[in-house]
Structure formats: structure tokens, C-alpha cells
Amino acid sequence: MICKTQKLNNGKEIPTVGLGTWGMEDEAVLEGAIRNALSLGYRHIDTAFIYGNEKMIGNILKKLFDEGVVQRKDLFITSKLWNTFHGCPEDGLRRSLNDLQMDYVDLYLIHWPVTFDPAPDGTVESCGKKYNVGKFDAVGVWKKMEALVDLGLAKSIGISNFGKANTEKILGTCRICPAAIQIELHPYLNQKELVEFMKSKGIQVISYSSLGSAPGSSAKVRDDKTIKAIAKKYGCAPSQIILSYITAQGICVIPKSRSKEHLRENIDLKELSREDISAIDALNTGHRYVDPPGFGPEKFK
């Protein structure tokens, strides 16, 4: 049976399945997705400063709080520190909290192990095609992240898109261990070695791009013939097989969907046989759908 929550190393719990919001920039569409998700029992909403939708999410959730649909204490909200705020994570988080209209987030992640120095005009919102990549100081940024927990602005802190090297730098000096890591993970990129390392350190793994696709990409994991054959065997959608495969490993997922039907499918997970899990394991090619150019040599390290 798939557990509904996973316990973090600080004793707090994170829902196994959450709602991803990357790419959702239309407020009406986003509100529909959040309302549908909450009605189905979702309680984790994943966002980030760079997604550009935190203000919309804040407006939507305030409306839902006022309507009595859900209470803040029942939600798990994740946001992420953008690359231009490494010098002052508190500033980055306070901007997100202001937009979200919240006093705290449940999980705050360093979005990338990549630092962007401010633009010549002093702005920090840079996210275009030209990046002013600076030197990433994993230990220094993490110490500032720890202060966010002390201030009560984040219940848990973690990392995203990190590999073993930068994670070990943090673990060697940290006062508060990263509670979670968010990485691209799907049958074509199962990241077995990194997952085992994170588990050995008590760091909860969260998969993004779980269904294996990205804007402009060609081969989608859910169209893979092996995935489709297993889905036919279980009488369900290919996406359900992929999410079942990932969550069976104790990994959280945050699939994005606007459709209530798909949202329902994404929490209706199946118990896969060992044979089917092995068949999906064999699909690993190491293919990344998310590999931003211009992010420098530290990305994924």
C-alpha cells in the first residue's frame, strides 16, 4: 500500500502526492486546478518564486480559506529560493511569503546549486536567457537557510537539483540537515544511485517531471510501449503506472494537472509486481528533460 505521507528527518510529514504548479500562469486555470485538487484530498501545493504564480496562489488560497474550504494548518506549501537570492535567502523567502499571503512555508528549497549575481542595475529578478553566473557557496547559503527555520519562516528546509558533491558539503557542516531534495526523476532518469545516497542520509526525495515530458520535448515516458503495456495490464492510465513506480520507492511526486479526472488518477496509485517494477527499471537511459543551458558547471553537482 502506498503511504499517504512520508516522514521527514525532523519528524514532520509531507504528503506523498502533491500538486505541481510550474507553468500554470493563468489565474482562472490555476484556481480550477487547486480547487479540484483540494476537493480530491490533495494537501501539498508546490510552487517557486521563479514560477511567477505565487501571488495568484496566495489570492486563490485566501479565497478558499475565507470560504472555509480548507485551513492553512492543513496544507503543506513548498516554495524555492531563486538563484539571485543566494546572498540573502531571507529576502527571497519574505517576497514569496508576501505573495502567498502566509507567515511561513512548510518546505523551502534552494532551487539550484547555481548562483546568479545581480544584474548591473541591481535587480535580482533575472531569469532571462542571459545569466550572470557567480560562484555557488553551498555551505554559506545553507547557513542562511538554517536561519529561516530559526525565524519561523520555514518549517523545513531542503535542496533541489543537487548532486552528491554539494550535498556532502552541506552535511559536513550543517546544524539543520536538509529535510528533502527535489530532483528530476522518472523511468528514463531513475537516479537510483543518488536516491540511495539521499535515503542513507535521511533526506526525503521528491520527484519532479515525474511523467517525463517538457515543453518541446519529443519522446514522452507515458508514451513508452513498456509503460503502456503495463498500464493496459492494470487497466489504468500510463501516468498512474509511472507515479506508482516512483512512490513505491518512498519517493514523493508533484505532478501537474488542470483536469479533475487526471488529478484523480494521479492519487489512485497501484501496487506493481516486482516483474513490472524491474521492467520499468530497465527503461533508464539517463535522459534529462530539464537541463537549462547557461547554468554553469555546478548544476546537478
From Swiss-Prot:
Pfam families with a match to the protein in the record: Aldo_ket_red (PF00248)
Residue sites binding substrate per the record: H111
UniProt KW keywords: Cytoplasm, NADP, Oxidoreductase
Oxidoreductase as UniProt keyword: yes
EC primary class: oxidoreductase
Compartments reported by the entry: Cytoplasm
GO CC annotations, alphabetized: cytoplasm
EC number: 1.1.1.21
Presence of keyword DNA repair: no
GO molecular function, one term: aldose reductase (NADPH) activity
Catalytic activity: an alditol + NAD(+) = an aldose + NADH + H(+); an alditol + NADP(+) = an aldose + NADPH + H(+)
Entries under PROSITE patterns matching the protein: ALDOKETO_REDUCTASE_1, ALDOKETO_REDUCTASE_2
Protein residues bound to NADP(+): 11-20, 209-266
InterPro entries cross-referenced by the UniProt entry: AKR, Aldo/ket_reductase_CS, NADP_OxRdtase_dom, NADP_OxRdtase_dom_sf
Active site: Y51 (proton donor)
Family statement drawn from the similarity comment of this UniProt entry: Belongs to the aldo/keto reductase family.
Role: Catalyzes the NADPH-dependent reduction of a wide variety of carbonyl-containing compounds to their corresponding alcohols with a broad range of catalytic efficiencies.
Identification of the protein by name: Aldose reductase
Native source species: Encephalitozoon cuniculi (strain GB-M1)
High-level lineage: Eukaryota, Fungi, Fungi incertae sedis, Microsporidia, Unikaryonidae
